[in-house]
Amino acid sequence: MATQHIENKLKLLPDLPGCYMMKDINSRIIYVGKAKNLKNRVRSYFKSSHEGKTAKLVSEIRNFETIITSTDKEAFLLEITLIQKHKPYYNIKLKRGTGYPYIKITHEKDPQLKIVSQVKKDGGYYFGPYPNVYAATETLQLLQKVYPLRRCNGYQKRPCLYYHMGQCLGACFKEVPQSEYEKQIKKIKSFLNGNVSKIKKELEQKMETASENLEFERAAEIRDQIHYVEMTVEKQKIISNDNTPRDLFAFYMNKGWLSLQIFSIRQARLMKREKRLFPCIDTPEAELESFILQFYNQKNRILPKEILVPSGMDKETLSEILGIPVKTPQRGQKRDLLEMAQKNARLVLEEKFRLLELDERKTTGAMNEITDALGLPNGHRIEAFDHSHLQGEDLVSAMVCFIDGKPEKTEYRKYKLKNVDHADEAASTREVIYRRYSRLLKEKANLPDLILMDGASIQINAAVDVLHNQLGIDIPVAGMVKNDRHKTADLMTENDEKIGLDPKSEGFYLLQRIQDEVHRFAITFHRQVRSKNSLASRLERIQGVGPKTRIKLLRNYGSLKNISAASVEDLESLGISKKVAQTIKLSLKN
């Protein structure tokens, strides 16, 4: 039986081709599959009865992810890549090879064309895998006729049968110049990379001639050959037409949230898909620019040869900083890939919003699950707090209110911190808790049944201290703790005890919703404050400071305080002229 979380996600599946990844309780991928229609295929696991291995697989599924593609053939090719990468337990048959054919040009003195089932690091050229084994075989035979290499076993003092048929260059009885092989290999590689128009045209002419001569069986054979060529070497979005290592970034923004998709194309294949989802502080383009720089600043992150990004990005500056081309494709296969990534970004964000809507309708008992877990009497009102700042500047706090498991937005509050001038979680908590509840006491308003802090013991202890020792009131306080992946994980009590909720329970969904909402609200408010006095906007107003200079200052100093503290000589060492450096110092004093 599917959990409520899975039931909700099943309602949101698209009627599109793609791949799905089934995950267990530890978020490990245990099965990868492909589908012409993701909605129908994934639902079938949970809406039908199963036996044996499939029944065991379904019993272990706790979550799933999808990647949409443009065609079911792309889904097939992506499935193979994902299986080879993740090696899911229930895809055991594909672990030692895909089971699907590749066409290989061997790395030998006298090279051959072969059909193989695995890719090896042996210097050969591999093309595929191909969904249709028969079509791949027929295409191989066509290539052997049109662009022959060696088809015999090698030198045997006399010409082989294939040489007489024009399907072997003659390694069987003579020394074949390497230049001749290289010429043929170049043509074969071009053909298998999708440049088939010349051969198709020749085949079509032969088919017409055969029809005119009433050789209908021959015409049908040629027609089938054309079909096999199209099936085998048809251009795919998941497989690019060159081996350039490239990363592709796409985004979708809505309701203050930004969804990112990162596609890593290696060896002409989509080798990795990463996704990020977070509240957007700046414009989506600026957020993505910042994200890309941080992305490649991580340890062990290797730069590709090329980066593809949406329009509106500062490609020139990104390219200068990273030292590689950053482009926005306008047409063709790369543009299609970018659109596919953007479509995936949109679906991920829409799924989040629609899941929240579905969860909101199922709040019965969710509040009680949280209070029961904390050993508290059942209540109705939760108030949650979070702080936000950037490099210790523009410090703000925000509070959201949930009544009976639903957000009560008229009760939301924003706070500009007055007594804290640097990043200090305890001090920020003390100030906002005192301001909020001293006011409620003064107004004789209703107090909440539970206070949740976005954090752990530091925030909890500071809040309890203010409530007990300064205000003399007893309101339970708990922390919302995140895991290493920055996702909601546990509750923390006033005694520093971590309490886990069932990740698929309504109580956990409510906790996750509250944490996401207070974080979003705090960041949105911080963005408003920061935009009025942000580092970027202050620098933009300084005469002589353009985009490149701004990037240099941001990368080297990070805050107005640090730039103000720098000497004119320090600024000059970044390649900034003395006049502009003096202007910067003067402007930031005001």
From Swiss-Prot:
Its main location: cytoplasm. The keyword Transit peptide does not apply. GO terms for molecular function: DNA binding; excinuclease ABC activity. Residues 197-232 form the UVR domain. SUPFAM superfamilies: C-terminal UvrC-binding domain of UvrB, GIY-YIG endonuclease, RuvA domain 2-like. GO terms for biological process: nucleotide-excision repair; SOS response. Residues 15-92 form the GIY-YIG domain. It is found in: Cytoplasm. It holds the Pfam family HHH_5. GO terms for cellular component: cytoplasm; excinuclease repair complex. The keyword Cytoplasm applies. The UvrABC repair system catalyzes the recognition and processing of DNA lesions. UvrC both incises the 5' and 3' sides of the lesion. The N-terminal half is responsible for the 3' incision and the C-terminal half is responsible for the 5' incision. Belongs to the UvrC family. HAMAP family: UvrC (MF_00203). NCBIfam families: uvrC (TIGR00194). This is UvrABC system protein C. It comes from Ligilactobacillus salivarius (strain UCC118). The lineage of its organism: Bacteria, Bacillati, Bacillota, Bacilli, Lactobacillales.
